[in-house]
């Protein structure tokens, strides 16, 4: 039976630009994926339900074997399923707490292969006027969907180098996105200044 997969994924192998401007495959290639898996809505029935989609999605990850994955829109039940079905990956997500509601925490997760990476640091910020505190995007007409970026700093056990990976969830309204891109870039530059030798990946 064919399943309709309600997610959008981009998988790429990173390349390095060597001194003469030639693009070459890195000595230790890094395969990264960004994927909006769509939340498990009760309105999604049959082949569009998460129960029908989750195994094909996991199979795709197993087939492509990305080293790092940025995910948007997973909910609690989906987190639990992916943790159970993908035990070879470690993960970072923002959990609700006394200061951050479930809605404000949005929904995002970064996964990385346990055997290849160690997580040295992690963080998050909202794509809005107060990035350190829960906020909606600038001039948002949608008052329900918070948008944010989460990130991890990983140590690559193969190359010995550090890698920053950012997973960004942009708003629906295209008019809000330029400000979000600008905010994303500024925050990333501030974080990246901590080290000049790290690779930096934004999804």
Briefly describe each language-model feature range:
Residues 7-19:
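Bacterial N-terminal signal peptides
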Residues 146-168, 179-203:
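His/acidic metal-ligating clusters that form di-metal
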Residues 72-172:
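Structured beta-strand-rich core segments of catalytic domains in phosphoester-bond hydrolases
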Residues 34-55, 99-100, 128-144, 171-193:
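Acidic/histidine-rich helix-loop elements
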Residues 15, 22-85, 99-105, 198-199:
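N-terminal, active-site-proximal structural segment of metallo-dependent hydrolase catalytic domains
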Residues 1-4:
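Positively charged n-region of N-terminal signal peptides that target proteins for export
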